[in-house]
Amino acid sequence: MKIHEYQGKEILRKFGVAVPRGKPAFSVDEAVKVAEELGGPVWVVKAQIHAGGRGKGGGVKVAKSLEQVREYANQILGMQLVTHQTGPEGQKVNRLLIEEGADIKQELYVSLVVDRISQKIVLMGSSEGGMDIEEVAEKHPELIHKVIVEPSTGLLDSQADDLATKIGVPAASIPQARAILQGLYKAFWETDASLAEINPLNVSGDGKVVALDAKFNFDSNALFRHPEIVAYRDLDEEDPAEIEASKFDLAYISLDGNIGCLVNGAGLAMATMDTIKLFGGEPANFLDVGGGATTEKVTEAFKLMLKNPGLKAILVNIFGGIMRCDVIAEGVIAGSKAVNLNVPLVVRMKGTNEDLGKKMLADSGLPIISADSMEEAAQKVVAAAAGK
């Protein structure tokens, strides 16, 4: 689960991390009112969407008068903000963050992530803040510094000081940087975050260290422990299909292709998408119905996929272990009839009750294209999507 920058800063503030004074605004008049309350002479008007690259897309403006605050708020609110993370369609801006201006002298980068290789938390930092860290990592990997944090001990002061020194924090500002890194780590740990990022971490001309941005991602599996985090959820920023899928315990992610995928198991789902791409197709979604799929879940999965206007074909790829093939077949038949399926459907099933499942599909009277292997299924669905 993602949250907005201003919400991330609320969390950082609770853990003692220095952030600029600011408040969210949901209208132009409210933006001006917040600016008046903060006092000038400089304010920053920032679009709030769940994507990075807002500045380059025109979603961050520096205002030097209340008239400019009004002008920029009017420009940004309601716009379709396009960044490298939103795709060409962009995301609509429904809220702003109005902040006091900052004296920017040195922009740094720090973040915390879970490293699946070491199975520990990794603190990362770079002297190249204020820009896309992916670009820095690709072109100048030597500028990315990493610290492995032992969960049993937490982030040590010596580790925080060492990283701060490596990324260029002046010696006089090291104690402030240490406090910010410790606060960031505690926020990450206590909220069950999967990512906590400050970019940029600013060192001002007088040596003050302040987090000018905040980005958090949270482990959705741990949200039951954090109602205060769930309260930050903004459904307007999420894919409606993914929201609908969560109601039926379906793991669904929308993609840009035209071939729908219905699979049981995340690993098989990813392998299925890879195989489709291998044969020249493009998956329209990731959809894992899980090991306990019911007829209702399969029917809802079909409904979700068919809401995509660009859908050209569907591939159902099932390995029947815990999940029985006859149950999937029943769901495929019911789902196809319930939604009046009007795109080609390729089905490949292997495992428990495989023969029964295939017979049910054959006897259904539906124009289902059968396949015995994943490669054959992928080739057939790619051809069907192309109208061949």
UniProtKB/Swiss-Prot annotation:
It comes from Burkholderia multivorans (strain ATCC 17616 / 249). GO terms for biological process: succinyl-CoA metabolic process; tricarboxylic acid cycle. ATP binds at residues 46, 53-55, 99, 102, 107. It comes from the Bacteria. This is Succinate--CoA ligase [ADP-forming] subunit beta. InterPro entries: ATP-grasp, ATP-grasp_succ-CoA_synth-type, ATP_grasp_subdomain_1, Succ-CoA_synthase_bsu_CS, SUCC_ACL_C, Succ_CoA_ligase-like_bsu, Succinyl-CoA_synth-like. Mg(2+) binds at residues 199, 213. Residues 9-244 form the ATP-grasp domain. It holds the Pfam family ATP-grasp_2. Its cofactor is Mg(2+). Keywords: ATP-binding, Ligase, Magnesium, Metal-binding, Nucleotide-binding, Tricarboxylic acid cycle. One of its GO terms (cellular component) is succinate-CoA ligase complex. Heterotetramer of two alpha and two beta subunits. It is an enzyme of class 6 (ligase). Belongs to the succinate/malate CoA ligase beta subunit family.
